[in-house]
Swiss-Prot record:
Compositional bias (Basic and acidic residues): 157-166
Single GO MF descriptor: ribosome binding
Main location: nucleus
InterPro entries, per database record: Nucleotide-bd_a/b_plait_sf, RBD_domain_sf, RBM, RBM3/CIRBP_RRM, RRM_dom, RRM_dom_euk
Region ranges (Disordered): 68-166
PTM comment: Methylated on arginine residues within RGG motifs. Methylation by prmt1 promotes cytoplasmic accumulation.
Localization per Swiss-Prot or TrEMBL: Nucleus, Nucleoplasm; Cytoplasm
Name of the protein in question: Cold-inducible RNA-binding protein B
Start and end residues of each RRM domain: 5-83
The organism's taxonomic lineage, starting at the top: Eukaryota, Metazoa, Chordata, Craniata, Vertebrata
Record field: compositional bias (Low complexity): 133-149
Cross-referenced PANTHER family: TRANSFORMER-2 SEX-DETERMINING PROTEIN-RELATED
Family annotation (PROSITE patterns): RRM
Organism field: Xenopus laevis (African clawed frog)
Entry's induction text: By tcf7l1/tcf-3.
């Protein structure tokens, strides 16, 4: 399926659901799918979603008309989901599912996620890492790439090489 008529909707009120989103956007054309992305554990909205129109031209109209408008009291951002600014979409995908996988791996290693959480305090996580050899490698690999890791792009590189050190 093509992403042509698919719009990314960001900045949603956490109370906004599929029905209210569909109500707001349906005046621009026939909608084939509305998704509000929810947290798997808490089932609460994560503040963004997608609206897919049958006709890509309707999606463009909706994007022009709704970007920056308020829905349920919050200003939303509307963007095409599939175009080259889709690296934003990649960021969300990577940040949610990829990030969760990263934590899962960390937890299995006995608290590797602590290093991830405190990566801002490099000296502190360095202190943690001193006790075990594998952790040492983990923090040193981290210090050079902590920016990319957070963006959701290059964390996979350090994660993959991390896995081969077992």
């Amino acid at each position: 399926m093509s992403d042509e008529g698919k719009l990314f909707i960001g900045g949603l009120n956490f109370d906004t659901n599929e029905e209210s989103l569909e109500q707001v956007f349906s005046k621009y054309g026939q909608i084939s799918e509305v998704v509000v992305v929810k947290d798997r554990e808490t089932k609460r909205s994560r503040g963004f979603g997608f609206v897919t129109f049958e006709n890509p031209d309707d999606a463009k109209d909706a994007m022009m008309a709704m970007n920056g408008k308020a829905v349920d009291g919050r200003q939303i951002r509307v963007d095409q989901a599939g175009k080259s600014s889709g690296d934003r979409r990649g960021g969300y995908r990577g940040g949610s599912s990829g990030g969760r996988g990263f934590f899962r791996g960390g937890r299995g290693r006995g608290g590797g996620d602590r290093g991830y959480g405190s990566s801002r305090f490099d000296n502190r996580s360095g202190g943690y890492g001193g006790s075990s050899g594998s952790r040492d490698y983990y923090s040193s690999g981290r210090s050079q790439g902590s920016y990319g890791d957070r963006a959701g792009g290059s964390y996979r590189d350090s994660y993959d090489s991390y896995a081969t050190h077992e």
